[in-house]
């Protein structure tokens, strides 16, 4: 990305993320990646870069966030995100316990998306939310406050 665009900011270069500046706007662009093991219920211990889109999509939180588009293939939806979007459903990619164990803040994201979009949470995903909610205690109060504040601000946008 840094070779394609003149103005970029290394916003998370260790995770393959740069912000491309176009005019007054910034767009985060992230290299396809595979997350290593999670040890703190928040961040992967290591990040491996890949050139396979499906591997990158597999690490996403919810099926509706695990879709991509390109001019050749058009919609890339290997996890049923469009079906869940059409059925107004929040569902984890793969095993919800694994997704929430990787990053406990995803629990709050599930609740936020459900409230914001008025989508129910799929039963297995909801069960994992209830089961793993105590893992939020491992997340700093500042991160939880930021997530809750973001949810509150977004609620007033609709």
Report residues per predicted region:
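Catalytic cores of the polymerase beta-like nucleotidyltransferase superfamily
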Residues: 1-157
């Amino acid at each position: 990305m840094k070779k394609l665009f003149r103005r970029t900011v290394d916003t998370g270069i260790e995770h393959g993320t740069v912000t491309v500046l176009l005019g007054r706007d910034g767009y985060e662009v992230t290299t396809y990646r595979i997350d290593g093991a999670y040890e703190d219920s928040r961040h992967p211990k290591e990040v491996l870069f890949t050139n396979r889109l499906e591997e990158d999509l597999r690490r996403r939180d919810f099926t509706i966030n695990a879709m991509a588009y390109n001019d050749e293939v058009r919609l890339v939806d290997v996890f049923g995100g469009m079906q869940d979007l059409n059925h107004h459903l929040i569902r984890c990619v793969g095993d919800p316990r694994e997704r929430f164990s990787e990053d406990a803040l995803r629990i709050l994201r599930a609740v936020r998306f459900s409230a914001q979009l008025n989508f129910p949470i799929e039963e297995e995903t909801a069960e994992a939310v209830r089961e793993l909610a105590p893992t939020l205690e491992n997340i700093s109060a500042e991160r939880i406050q930021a997530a809750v504040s973001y949810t509150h601000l977004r609620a007033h946008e609709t």
